[in-house]
Amino acid sequence: MSRFLVFALLLAGCQAQPPPAKPLVIRITTGLPGMTFKPLGEALATAFQAVITDARFEVIETAGSVANLQRLESGNADLGFALADVAYTAFNGRGMDFPTAAKNVRALAVLHPSAVHVLVPANSTARSVADLRGRIGVGPAGSGTAVTSALLLNAFGVSPKQITNQSLPFITASDALSAGELEAAFVVAADPVDAVQRATNAGARLIEIGGDQVRRLRVEYPFLRPGFIPGGTYKREPRSIQTMLVDVLLLTRVDLDEELVRRLTSVLFDVLPQLSASHDFLRMMDVRRAPATPIPLHPGAALYYREQELSR
């Protein structure tokens, strides 16, 4: 063997090896402490991590649905939760929060319904959303509650001139209601909700949502549907409360890998029984409705649902 060939082989052996590829990071954008999105995101991250070991899952705390959709649209998150009405509004470019349609967002699944809670002080004369006046806790800026409360106030004919919006965290709004600093507060979340429990323990009551206004609202937003807060869920509320339900969606970005999204969707349904054992609200998830999202499904999620149909 020539000296030149030996030298070349030695040199090749000394070449620096390329660094190992960095693991894929999947960012899950969630919600505020005390609400359902954050613990659900943490539970899903743990479940995904146990199965999809070639990726790393991170949980991001946010104000909620609006912030999550904005992060997904801008590429600053990979998975996230949002109320169905907010996702529909974002995808179609409606409202102040989404002047441009969020066309990069896609759906994985309908997860579970959230209930609309409208709280008023015990001595309030309000019996309907139409009666609300003054300082109203409409939900934190960036939350789904802020969008849903605006839809309901408008549907019930409450003029912006008749109220002062207070964009407070839910626990803060609960305490402000008890202290006489708010005339009402909205909370949209799966029961039971810590902030609602806190308010009712201090004497607040829930008002019902129903009537022609709701029927008209559903013409434009059919995924808002009538429902009930079961009696006994909250102190001083022994009877069921008529309200509206809105689904929670698990969302992703359109550019996320199709096979990865198929795997994520598969893991979601594989671990659903275990998750439901520790998160009561997931027991309300109807797997038959999972693909019935108000915005387009990601191709990877659609592939999973087609596979399930073929396997039956």
Where are these predicted regions, by residue range?
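A structural signal for short loop-to-beta-strand junctions that line the ligand-binding cleft
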Residues: 98-111, 116, 233-242
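Bacterial signal peptide processing site
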Residues: 15-17
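Extracytoplasmic small-molecule ligand-binding "clamshell" domains
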Residues: 36-73, 78-80, 236-238
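Bilobed "Venus flytrap"/periplasmic-binding protein-like clamshell domains
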Residues: 23-51, 55, 113-179, 291, ...
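Segments of small-molecule ligand-sensing domains
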Residues: 241-312
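Pocket-lining segment of extracytoplasmic ligand-binding domains
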Residues: 84-86, 94-96, 124, 158-250, ...
